[in-house]
Amino acid sequence: LTDLDALIALVRRAGELALSFYGRVVPSEKPDRSFVTEADKAVEEFLRSELGKHFPGVEVLGEEVERGVEKSVAWVVDPIDGTANFVAGVPIWAVCVGLVEEGTPTLGAVYYPAFGELYAAQQGKGAWLNGNPIHARTDDDIRRDDLLGLSTLSVKRMQVQLPCKIRSLGTAVACFTFVAKGSFIGGILTDNRVWDIAAGWVIAKEAGAEVVQLRTGEPMTKLPLTRESLPHLLVAPPQFIPRIREGVRL
């Protein structure tokens, strides 16, 4: 088994565990008023344990356990990205695991168990959906029926003056995976942490998309292994980035 094969198998098992809770959880509120469930905690515990067995010595930074990391290589885990969807019975939620080395995501897997899509990527090797290669859009025309993904807070804060349609799916990683497979022309993300980004980042990059800071257009070259909030980000194929940045009012 390669590291990527092992990661895919782990994320699939974690997704099945999450699915066993789906439709029967009672959420509690975190200090920031966002939801957390017994499923989030159980999935993160499972991933911490299994990653520790398969990749001994590599630290884990996760959303639900308030513990930092000390080295420059770590697994970054979001046990359920889209907890509000999960609680409400909306099937757009995912288990996300990425490996960050010296600030760069190098391996990633994202699994949507409720509809069976598993995305994976390895730096320099490509990106796949359920084992088939995927690629972001390569044309340069933004059409009326094209889709631009916005995170929940982006929708509340931004005006979009582009001919396309807007989709806010309630999970940050969807902006990355749906850009990677060519479903979205881009995705705009605000108020995210590294665990929202790491796995999706390598998938989108390997599929031909770029990740830039929305305000400046500067490439986002490194991800911090901290719990800090990240700047507003845009993920999109390079040919769409100038148009999208021009068409979005912060």
What annotation goes with each model-predicted range?
Residues 62-64, 131, 170, 215:
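Short loop/edge segments at beta-strand edges and connector loops
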Residues 1-80:
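N-terminal subdomain of lithium-sensitive/metallo-dependent phosphomonoesterases centered on the IMPase/IPPase/PAP
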Residues 18, 40, 51, 83, ...:
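Residue-level signal for inorganic ion chemistry
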Residues 41, 64, 79-82, 113, ...:
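Generic detector of well-ordered alpha-helical packing
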Residues 70-132:
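DPxDG-like acidic metal-binding loop motif
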